[in-house]
Amino acid sequence: YEMTSSLVGSEMCIRDRLPAVFHVSARALASHALSIFGDHQDVMACRQTGFALLASGSVQEAQDLAAVAHLSAIKSSIPFLHFFDGFRTSHEIQKIEALDEEELKNMVSKKSLKAFRDRALNPDAPVTRGTAQNGDVYFQAVESRNNYYNAVPDIVARYMGEISEMTGREYRPFTYYGAADAENIIVAMGSVTETIKETIDYLAKKGRKYGLVTVHLYRPFAEKYFLKVLPKTVKRIAVLDRTKEPGALGEPLYLDVKALFQGQSNSPLIIGGRYGLSSKDTTPAQIVAVYDNLELNEPKNDFTIGIVDDVTFKSLSIKSEVSIVKPGTTECKFYGLGSDGTVGANKNTIKIIGSHTQKYCQAYFDYDSKKSGGYTCSHLRFGDKPIKAPYLSLI
C-alpha cells in the first residue's frame, strides 16, 4: 500500500517527465490478510502509472541494473521503478563485484543532465505546469508522450550494453538462457530466474533441453527485444507470475506474452502459472514440475507451484526434491528464536568469510513476522564457485 500510494502521489514525475528512480523491494499487498513478505503484487499494481519498470533477479543484478535505471532515466526523461524481490533479494547477503563510480560518471549523458537542470523552476523564467485540461486537448496531450516511451527500450539496451562491457556480465531488456534449440521454455522475472537457470543446467546433464527468457525491462514491454532472443524452435511457453490478480483471465506477465503472439501464425502454446506469493519458497523440483507440465499432451494452464491446492486443484504435483548445489559448496542451518542473537551472529560470520577468504558466500534468514521470540533459521552457503540458489537450504 505504501509504495502504490507513494507513486500515485508522484504523478508530477510523469507529468513533468522527471528522471526520478525508485528502488523497490517488491512485497505482497494486503488482501484477506496482511503480509510483510515478498512477491510482485505491489509492483504490478503500479504498472499503469507511466513509470518504466526494471527488474533485477539477484544482489549483483540489483547493483548493476540500479545504475542502468539512473542512466536511462536521465537520458529518456522518464521516471523508473527498479524492483527486486522483497526479502529474497533485498535481505540476502552476497559477495558481489562493485561497479567503478568513475566509469559510471563517464556514462552519464551530460546533455540530458543539463536539459533536466535547465527545466528547474526559476522565478526569472516562470512556467505553468500541472494544469487542468478539458476534453478538447487532454486526449491529444496523453498520446503526444508516445515517442518518449517508444525510445526507452533502445536507451535501456544501450546502457545495459555499456554496463555489460564494463563488467563482463550480460544484460539486455530480455535475456535467454538454455539450449539454443529448446522447444519448451519459461518466461519469468525476479530471483526465480536464478533457480530456473540452475535447474536448466541440471536437466541438461540428463539430456533434456529447456530454456528461459528473463524479463528485465518489463515496462515498456519491447516486442522486438523479446523476439530477438527467443529461439525459433520454441513450441511451448510457461509464463510464471509472482502475483495474483483475482478475476482476471490471467496474470500480468502472462497476458503480455499472450498479446505479443496474438494473430501470429504458428505461434507457440502459452500457459501461465503463479508461484512465490508472500515469499513462498520456489525450489528446483518445482521448476522441474513446470517443465514436466509443458511436456504433457495437454499442459495445465493457470497452475500454481509451491503449495498443495486441495480447494481449487490448480497446483502441479511435485516429485522428490532435487539438490543442485555445486560441488565444493558448504551449506549450514542455524535455528534460533527472534532476538536471541543467532541471526546477527550468522551475519557477522558470513561477512567475515566473504571478506577474509576467496570463498563465494550467501546468507539468507528465514523468520516469521513476529518481533522477539519467533522462529528463525539462518541459511548459510559458501564455496569456490558463484552461488546462485535463491531458495532455502534443502539439507
Identify what each model region corresponds to.
Residues 80-176:
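Conformationally flexible catalytic loops at phosphate/diphosphate-handling active centers
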Residues 34-86, 110, 263-276:
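Conserved thiamine diphosphate
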Residues 161-184, 316-329:
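Glycine-/acidic-rich phosphate or pyrophosphate-binding loops and their flanking alpha/beta elements
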Residues 33-51, 226-245, 365-395:
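A structural-propensity feature for long, helix-poor, extended segments
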Residues 1-9, 14:
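Single conserved hydrophobic/aromatic residue that forms the stacking wall/gate
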Residues 166, 180-181, 187-216, 328-394:
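Anionic-ligand anchoring segments at beta-strand to alpha-helix junctions in alpha/beta enzyme folds, i.e.
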Residues 236-325:
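Peripheral docking tails and interdomain loops at the edges
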Residues 85-124, 228-265, 271:
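Terminal amphipathic helices with adjacent charged low-complexity linkers/tails
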